[in-house]
């Protein structure tokens, strides 16, 4: 696209044409993972050329001429009109949460920004927490929005921010962000709501998120409202189309009809790359695609908090009892075999639950608990046997032949 249409950012006339083409192809919804924070300074020559043919410019001063050129070549107006006419566009915006380590953010949301975001709140909200309850939701501190003309024209807006962990990997997305009494959904959820036209609802309890659903589909989140992303593969797992091919008519109704379309940068230098579990340089727009596909297909990864601790305790208890019984009747190599069987058996079950059932259970704790139990029994048994051998050697070495003493140490019974 950059090779065909020139460097980024493009004139807004291109973006207007892109919306018209995608909307005309019958797309279900169009989401822009792109921020348009400033007015476009580009004046399209073709628009001015057409307008000159219709206006007498013989008696016009320079100031009036510049104002007239801006009016006829107002690419922002053209883009806003395309967004409004489409009735399918969702715009993204960036947020900084409290405690964000990406920079020192002192700015707060202005009254104008709050007014711009007002229509993008959760449509249905039930709160069972009390004033003063410290509900563990992520709090929005400031935001970066597109210019008001675009936000007003869009069907909806949603934040495109993720939750990067200490290793920099994006595994979670906040499904709810709070600002005062207002609750806001993310970009991906807003797109899905627009595509399905189903009601979006959230229920807040004193401990955090109690329920979040679109229509009758309930989405699993943590108490703070974070959703664990189920990645389908490395970068470019989803179908990518060049924007220039859409603008040139090479991609149209056949490819785009009834599809959820995300528009974003994937070229080097656009700076919208994340680190995913599959590695770095993962296009941010494709992270949103994974989230939307998760929600559409209900491919959730669930952490079963209700019985997870019972499973860990059960593994430790059962492995301890079994290894303890084996240590009484069998040699160390039998214990080692039992340990390997237990570890690889658990890893197999763990892998099956994760890949086939979407259940995320602890891997490290149960495996290491078996190793620690085995190590403890082995050390205890070795110490006990050594003490018994010393006793036999001291008690019988003066009265029996060395060969007989060795036989007694090998078989104390």
Predicted regions and their residues:
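Non-transmembrane functional regions of envelope-associated proteins
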Residues: 1-218, 222, 256-334
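Short low-complexity stretches enriched in small and charged residues
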Residues: 127-131, 147, 214-227, 355-362, ...
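Helix N-cap / beta->alpha transition motif
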Residues: 188, 241-244, 361-362
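Transmembrane alpha-helices and their extracellular/periplasmic helix-loop junctions
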Residues: 294-403
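Catalytic NTP-binding/metal-coordinating core of nucleotidyl cyclase/transferase enzymes
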Residues: 413
């Amino acid at each position: 696209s950059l090779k065909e249409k020139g460097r980024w950012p493009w004139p807004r006339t291109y973006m207007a044409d892109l919306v018209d083409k995608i909307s005309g192809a019958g797309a279900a919804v169009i989401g822009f993972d792109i921020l348009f924070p400033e007015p476009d300074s580009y004046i399209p020559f073709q628009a001015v050329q057409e307008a000159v043919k219709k206006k007498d410019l013989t008696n016009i001063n320079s100031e009036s001429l510049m104002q007239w050129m801006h009016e006829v070549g107002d690419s922002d107006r053209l883009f806003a009109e395309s967004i409004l006419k489409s009735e399918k566009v969702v715009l993204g915006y960036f947020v900084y949460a409290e405690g964000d380590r990406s920079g020192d953010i002192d700015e707060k949301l202005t009254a104008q920004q709050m007014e711009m975001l007002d229509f993008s709140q959760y449509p249905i909200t039930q709160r069972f927490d009390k004033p003063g309850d410290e509900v563990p939701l992520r709090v929005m501190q400031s935001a970066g929005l597109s210019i008001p003309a675009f936000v007003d024209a869009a069907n909806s807006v949603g934040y495109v921010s993720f939750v990067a962990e200490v290793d920099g990997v994006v595994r979670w997305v906040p499904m709810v962000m709070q600002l005062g009494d207002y609750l806001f959904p993310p970009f991906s959820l807003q797109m899905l709501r627009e595509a399905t036209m189903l009601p979006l609802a959230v229920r807040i309890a004193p401990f955090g998120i109690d329920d979040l659903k679109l229509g009758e589909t309930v989405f699993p989140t943590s108490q703070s409202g974070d959703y664990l992303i189920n990645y389908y593969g490395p970068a470019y797992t989803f179908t990518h189309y060049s924007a220039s091919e859409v603008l040139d008519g090479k991609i149209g109704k056949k490819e785009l009809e009834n599809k959820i379309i995300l528009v974003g940068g994937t070229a080097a230098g656009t700076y919208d790359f994340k680190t995913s579990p599959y590695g770095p340089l993962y296009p941010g727009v494709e992270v949103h695609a994974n989230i939307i596909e998760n929600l559409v297909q209900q491919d959730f990864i669930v952490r079963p908090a209700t019985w997870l601790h019972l499973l860990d305790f059960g593994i430790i208890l059962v492995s301890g009892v079994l290894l303890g019984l084996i240590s009484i009747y069998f040699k160390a190599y039998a214990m080692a075999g039992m340990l390997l069987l237990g570890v690889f058996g658990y890893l197999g079950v763990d892998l099956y639950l994760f890949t086939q059932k979407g259940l995320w259970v602890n891997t490290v704790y149960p495996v290491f608990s078996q190793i620690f139990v085995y190590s403890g029994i082995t050390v205890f048994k070795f110490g006990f046997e050594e003490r018994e051998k010393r006793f036999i050697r001291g008690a019988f070495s003066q009265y029996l032949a060395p060969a007989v003493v060795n036989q007694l140490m090998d078989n104390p019974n």
